C-alpha cells in the first residue's frame, strides 16, 4: 500500500512502466541450462524447510527455544527462496522478463527483509548457544519462550522499519528510458543504476543499512562464538569440549557462507569490477543455497531432529 501510494503520487517521475530482467549477464544464449539445478535447489529448499516445520510442530520434545529459532530460520528460508525463484525460473523457461515497477520494488523489499531475518535469526541462535554452553545453569531462566518471541519480534520490527527505506528511495528516482536490468532479480543497485538522476542517497543508505544491520549482527555473532571458544578452552574435559565445539560447527559453517558471500558481492559491486556475471550469480546462489542447506545441516547434526524425521517419514 505504501509503495502503491508513492507510485501514484510520483507517476510523473516514471517514463517507463516496467523493467526487463535480462537474466544472467554474459551467458544469455545458454542461461536456460541453469534452470534445472536452480529448480532442484528450490524444490529441495521448499521440501526440506517445510519438513523441518512439520517435525518441530508435531514433536512435543522439540517445543524448545533452540528449535523455535530453527523454525523461524526455516520460514525465512522459504520466504527468501520463494521471493526470487519463481520469477527466475519464469525468465529461464518462458522468457517472462518483464516486471512492473511496483512488483520490482516489492520484491526488492522482500529480499532485503528475508535476508535480514536470516541474519537476525543467526544472532539469536548464537546467543542461545552462548547461554547453553557458557551459562548452562541459567539457560532455562534466560532463554524462555517469551525471550524467543520478544527477540524475534524486535528483530522483525527493526528490519521492516529500517529496510522500507530501500524501495522507497528507489521509487523516488527518475527512470527515463533505460529499463533493462542486467540481473534476474530486482536488486537495489541494479534498479537504481538505471535512474537518470543523482542516486548517491541510495548508495549511502545501502552502506548505512549494511553496517547498522548486518554489521551489528555479525559483531554479536563473532562476540558470542569468541566467548564460547574461550569457555570451551577452559574446560578440563576433552569430551565436553569436543561436544560443545561439535554443536557450534554447523552453525559456524552456515554463518561463514552467509556473510562471506555478502561481503564478496559488496566488494565486487563497490570496486566496479568488470565481472557482472559473478555478483549476479553469487547473489542468486546466496538466496537459494542457504535455504537448501540449512535444514539438512541442522537435521544431520541434531539427534532429536533426526528422530523426529524418522517418525514423520514412518521409518521407525
From Swiss-Prot:
Transmembrane segments: 33-53, 62-82, 107-127, 147-167, 204-224, 245-265, 280-300
Membrane topology, record value: Multi-pass membrane protein
Keyword Transmembrane helix tagged: yes
Pfam families in UniProt: 7tm_4
Places the protein is found: Cell membrane
Intrachain disulfide bonds: 104-196
Glycosylation sites: 10
GO terms assigned for molecular function: G protein-coupled receptor activity; olfactory receptor activity
Sorted UniProt keywords: Cell membrane, Disulfide bond, G-protein coupled receptor, Glycoprotein, Membrane, Olfaction, Receptor, Sensory transduction, Transducer, Transmembrane, Transmembrane helix
Main location, first listed in the record: membrane
Record's GO cellular component terms: plasma membrane
All ranges on the Cytoplasmic side of the membrane: 54-61, 128-146, 225-244, 301-316
InterPro entries: GPCR_Rhodpsn, GPCR_Rhodpsn_7TM, Olfact_rcpt, OR51/52/56-like
Signal peptide stretch: none
Residues in the Extracellular compartment per record: 1-32, 83-106, 168-203, 266-279
Biological role stated in the UniProt entry: Odorant receptor.
Family per similarity comment: Belongs to the G-protein coupled receptor 1 family.
Protein name, as recorded: Olfactory receptor 56B2
Organism the protein comes from: Homo sapiens
